[in-house]
């Protein structure tokens, strides 16, 4: 099994500038899922995707002229592995002095390598220079929890902060906070994010939910793992009929990671970059 502590994170790394797929470092999802009550073999209570955006993609055309693009990678949540982010960056940098016939050829290569590493089918989208002007920005929709004047001193995840008024009539709400902060599982470096929670069910106590999201502040876990922990805690403590959790994290090393988990059929998020990204 590949373990996070064996990854390139927190270690000096040589930056290869010619293509090397072996730089990708997969990490199994299952051990961290077991920690949140999802043992191996049990059906997952959610489905979804991890949306990765890469802003520093460059290669050479066959004449040696540099090319640049933005790339989006859509990784299904049911793949057995995630890819450690520093290894992803090193892998992308390995294209910098590599000659590739066309953007389409690069896209096919990225699709193959990422699918191999994650154990599933990864969608790859490239935005080349000609289409950079089509990119849009926008904030997460929803009622802002950060407006609440709460007091807290809890900075490790505490599901008991969550509650819902089960005697009340069901509601449909979309709640948003920009106060999500967690830390890298290996290095302890801060990860900053915005999170959107959409649900149908008994009204969730908003102050408790905000305190709960803030409680991740000293917690060490990868982005995908934090979102799955939020999803399972809200399901267990608040018992909504429908739930979708979407987080957009600020970029590091030219990459941002945006996990989405839901228990009902709904379109995937539209991947609009927000102002903090």
Curated annotation (Swiss-Prot):
Its EC number is 1.7.1.13. Catalyzes the NADPH-dependent reduction of 7-cyano-7-deazaguanine (preQ0) to 7-aminomethyl-7-deazaguanine (preQ1). Substrate binds at residues 83-85, 223-224. The active site is at residues 184, 191. It comes from the Bacteria. Keywords: Cytoplasm, NADP, Oxidoreductase, Queuosine biosynthesis. The gene is queF. It is found in: Cytoplasm. InterPro entries: GTP-CH-I_C/QueF, NADPH_dep_7-cyano-7-deazaG_red, QueF, QueF_N, QueF_type2. NADPH binds at residues 85-86, 252-253. Its main location: cytoplasm. This is NADPH-dependent 7-cyano-7-deazaguanine reductase. It comes from Cupriavidus metallidurans (strain ATCC 43123 / DSM 2839 / NBRC 102507 / CH34) (Ralstonia metallidurans). GO terms for molecular function: preQ1 synthase activity. It catalyses: 7-aminomethyl-7-carbaguanine + 2 NADP(+) = 7-cyano-7-deazaguanine + 2 NADPH + 3 H(+). Pfam families: QueF (PF14489), QueF_N (PF14819). The lineage of its organism: Bacteria, Pseudomonadati, Pseudomonadota, Betaproteobacteria, Burkholderiales. GO terms for biological process: queuosine biosynthetic process; tRNA modification. Homodimer. It is an enzyme of class 1 (oxidoreductase).
